[in-house]
Amino acid sequence: MARNKIALIGSGMIGGTLAHLAGLKELGDVVLFDIAEGIPQGKGLDIAESSPVDGFDAKYTGANDYAAIEGADVVIVTAGVPRKPGMSRDDLLGINLKVMEQVGAGIKKYAPEAFVICITNPLDAMVWALQKFSGLPAHKVVGMAGVLDSARFRYFLSEEFNVSVEDVTAFVLGGHGDSMVPLARYSTVAGIPLPDLVKMGWTSQDKLDKIIQRTRDGGAEIVGLLKTGSAFYAPAASAIQMAESYLKDKKRVLPVAAQLTGQYGVKDMYVGVPTVIGANGVERIIEIDLDKNEKAEFDKSVASVAGLCEACIGIAPSLK
C-alpha cells in the first residue's frame, strides 16, 4: 500500500514543524510548498536528514509549484502573513484573503479529494473563504483553532491544579479570536467539572476567570514574547492531531472550525464546535446545550466571525 501524501502549503515556522511532526509520526510522505524558492527544499532536506537518527521513513519534497501537491490525501494550509505585536488576527484579513484565493485554486486543480486543514488567520474567515475558493465539500475543509485553544486551556488548568495535562479535558467554542468561548461547565479534571472543583476548594472562581482570559489571549501572549513571529509548535501539533484522526479514521472528538448548517442557530459559516473527525472528514457536529450566558457569549463570537466574512465579501465579491 502506498504511503499517504501530506501537502503543506506554506513552509514557515508552522509548516516546518508540521513537516517534522508528520515524519516523526510516520503519517506519510511530505510535500512542502512555498512561493519562496529554496525554503521548502532546504527545510525538507534538513528534516529528511534527521530521519535516520529518529528512525522514520518518509520522503520529503520541496516545491514552488502547486503541481507537486497533486493527489495529496491531506493538505494543511499555513500560507499567509503571521501576526506581529500589536496586530489583531483581523488586521491580516486583506493580505491573507488574496493568499487563500491562490491556495484554493491550487487545491481545486491538484488535490480535489484531499482533507484540508486551514491554520491561516483570521482563521474562521479564512477557512470559510478557502472552502468557497476551492469548491471542495464543506465536510472536507476545516479550520484548526479549537484543538489549540483547548490545549492552552488544558495546560493552564493543569498548572493551576498541579495535575497531568492528560487528566484535564477542556472545551473551547466559537471563533478563534478574542471572543472565543472557553466553557468551564464542560471542562473537567478526571471527569470532575470545573465548577465542582471551585466548590471543592481546588481553585477560586476569580482564578478560573483569569485562566479563561489567559486562554483567550494565548496567541497574543506568545506574539508579545517572541516579538518577531507567532506560535508554531502548539498550532502544528494541533493540526497534526486532526490530520491523524482523518488518515487513521480514529473518529476523535475534536473542536474544529466546521461549516454549520443550522446547528447552534448558525448557517453557512465556519465556527469552532465539537466534531467527530474520521475518514469522511467531519463526520458529525456535536450540538451541546448552552445556558443563557454561554449562548450569549457564543452568539457574540459568531457575530464577530460574521463581520469578518462580510469584510471578505467586500474585498472579494465572488465569495457571496
Curated annotation (Swiss-Prot):
The active site is at H176. NAD(+) binds at G10, S11, G12, M13, I14, G15, D34, N96, I119, T120, N121. It is an enzyme of class 1 (oxidoreductase). Keywords: NAD, Oxidoreductase, Tricarboxylic acid cycle. One of its GO terms (biological process) is lactate metabolic process. Its EC number is 1.1.1.37. Substrate binds at R83, R89, N121, R152. It catalyses: (S)-malate + NAD(+) = oxaloacetate + NADH + H(+). One of its GO terms (molecular function) is L-lactate dehydrogenase activity. Gene3D superfamilies: Lactate dehydrogenase/glycoside hydrolase, family 4, C-terminal, NAD(P)-binding Rossmann-like Domain. It comes from the Bacteria. InterPro entries: L-lactate/malate_DH, Lactate/malate_DH_C, Lactate/malate_DH_N, Lactate_DH/Glyco_Ohase_4_C, Malate_DH_type3, NAD(P)-bd_dom_sf. Catalyzes the reversible oxidation of malate to oxaloacetate. Belongs to the LDH/MDH superfamily. MDH type 3 family. This is Malate dehydrogenase. It comes from Brucella anthropi (strain ATCC 49188 / DSM 6882 / CCUG 24695 / JCM 21032 / LMG 3331 / NBRC 15819 / NCTC 12168 / Alc 37) (Ochrobactrum anthropi). The lineage of its organism: Bacteria, Pseudomonadati, Pseudomonadota, Alphaproteobacteria, Hyphomicrobiales.
